[in-house]
Design a protein with these regions (language model features):
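A mid-sequence, solvent-exposed acidic-amphipathic segment
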Residues: 138-213
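Short amphipathic alpha-helix that is part of the acyltransferase structural core
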Residues: 1-30, 133-170
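Conserved donor-binding loop and adjoining core beta-sheet/short helix segment
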Residues: 3-8, 18, 23-24, 31-92, ...
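Conserved acetyl-CoA-binding loop-helix of GNAT-fold acetyltransferases
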Residues: 74-83, 216-222, 226-237
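Short hydrophobic/aromatic beta-strand or adjacent loop that forms the aromatic wall/cage
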Residues: 46, 123-127, 187
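Acyl-donor-binding surface of acyltransferase catalytic domains
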Residues: 53-57, 62-140
Length: 237
């Protein structure tokens, strides 16, 4: 069956939301982005391509710094990869295992040089979900962190990113700093501070749509690890 791929715009929002909202947890990045910027490239900052069979939307790919394919069909993933092409502008591919792995294979076939040598592959990274109150007592010290404590929070965020990814997020454009300031402006930065107002534990509400949100950026001061402090802190969020 022929698969046609074209750029999406705001006229495609109803079909796009219907496709993504069928699995809101795994598609939360996409839903959050569309909620903020729609599908118009000038607002979103990057293109989104849709794959169609007849007039039905059957797959998507977000082509920004994060390359995010959404599809279950091998032919659809191949068509989306062909539209992205052999020229790499993204720094990572993220999404479900069933979409990302074959999508990356198709890209590698297009250009081994551009796509065939990733710095790391996280092929088994479970997506954990809680949809009921925590079964443990929350840490009462967890609170929303405000701008008066931004510098301490930002240092913890940089340490977290560097530990997890293996490279520093700092760059001359201050993009990571602006990103953290934007989350703090929304009230999405949580932490535990000691008596000296130093952040010892942190996490962020990075994405949200409807009744679903994603917690990430979790970090605990290395000096406090091994004391079973993170679980009660997460429950506090």
């Amino acid at each position: 069956m022929r698969t046609r791929v074209r750029p999406l715009d705001d006229d495609d929002l109803p079909d796009t939301l219907a496709l993504l909202s069928a699995h809101p947890v795994e598609n939360l990045f996409f839903l959050d982005r569309i909620q903020q910027g729609g599908l118009k490239r000038s607002r979103l900052g990057c293109p989104v391509y849709g794959a169609f069979r007849h007039d039905d939307l059957v797959g998507l790919v977000h082509v920004g710094s994060n390359l995010v394919p959404v599809a279950d069909d091998e032919e659809v993933l191949a068509a989306l990869a062909a539209r992205v092409g052999p020229w790499r502008t993204s720094t990572s591919i993220m999404g479900t295992q069933r979409a990302v792995l074959p999508f990356h294979e198709h890209l590698t076939h297009l250009s081994e040089r551009a796509w065939g040598h990733p710095r790391a592959k996280r092929t088994d990274q479970p997506l954990l979900v809680i949809d009921a109150p925590p079964a443990i007592t929350p840490d009462p010290r967890v609170r929303i962190v405000g701008f008066e404590d931004f510098e301490s929070y930002f240092r913890a965020a940089v340490d977290m990113y560097t530990e997890e990814v293996g490279v520093s997020p700092l760059d001359p454009s201050n993009g990571y700093r602006r990103h953290m300031l934007a989350m703090m402006q929304r009230g999405d930065t949580f932490g535990i501070l000691d008596e000296h107002r130093i952040v010892r534990w942190k996490s962020d509400v990075a994405l949200s749509w409807g009744g679903v949100c994603q917690i990430q950026g979790v970090w605990l001061d290395p000096a406090l690890r091994g004391q079973r402090l993170s679980a009660p802190a997460m429950a506090g969020v």
